[in-house]
Amino acid sequence: LRRQRQMCIRDSTATIWGISFVAQSEGGDAVGAFTFNATRNLIGSLVLVPVILLLGRLNPSGKAVSSSSASEGNIFSRNRTLILGGVSCGICLCLASNFQQVGISYSSVGKAGFITACYIVIVPILGLFMKKKCSPFIWMAIVLALIGLYLLCITDGFSIGKGDILVLICAFLFSLHILVIDYFSPHVDGVKMSCIQFLVCGILTAIPALIFEHPQLSAFKGAWGSILYAGVMSCGVAYTLQIIGQKNMNPTVASLILSLESCISALAGWILLGQK
């Protein structure tokens, strides 16, 4: 039952992310990439604050809902691990999401979704250096998934442009993000770590946004719907579900499930944006 719940959580995460490609494409037309990402991540962090407070009331003993069963004497150690995990995830997410957001502005939603999903190959390769081996069956599933994603998302032939290179770098960085989550998630409260990662990502991204883009409040009028979806659903909900759902799960299997986002992105791009 626990495994089925984790699978359901991962499927929901991938679906929300897939639709988020449309929000990113639309929002990126109204405001700069850094401004969009800084705002969405800060919103994601704020959304989780009342959730953390509510869970704290429901769990008055102080034991983290999603943390390991460490003794009360290890509270300082758990908090240090929580902060380190949140900051590490935030840095990875900051780099990955900004490369993706800039890359999407030069590429189609479906193509960006396919290239991003290349983390299904990168994760197991990087995992080998962390002594996380995959069975031949999983490698076969990776190859079949990659072929299927290509046939679904790439309809006009495949050529490499500037945006595609940026999104490919993003795929590598998201692979690191998945592996960092795999390392920290069994030991910390997933909701709290997610909140910290968004705060770190939002602050780091706000720096180049203020320096290079000089955001004006008037520019947000045409982007609030996209920013709110990306902030509340993609960040606040989906990334938090990723941390919770990935707990004690093989990171390669997790990446395969998450690759469903590329299928959803292609479908959403076709329905909502008319991209073929």
Kindly give the residue locations of the regions a language model identified.
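Hydrophobic transmembrane alpha-helices of multi-pass small-molecule transport proteins
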Residues: L48, C134-I154, F174, T205, ...
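Transmembrane alpha-helical segments that form core, pore/gating elements
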Residues: F34, G44-L48, V123-P124, F129, ...
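Specific transmembrane alpha-helical segments of multi-pass solute transporters/efflux pumps
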Residues: S20-F21, L55-T116, L151, G231-M249
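Loop-to-transmembrane alpha-helix entry segments
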Residues: R80, L84, G113-T116, F129-G148, ...
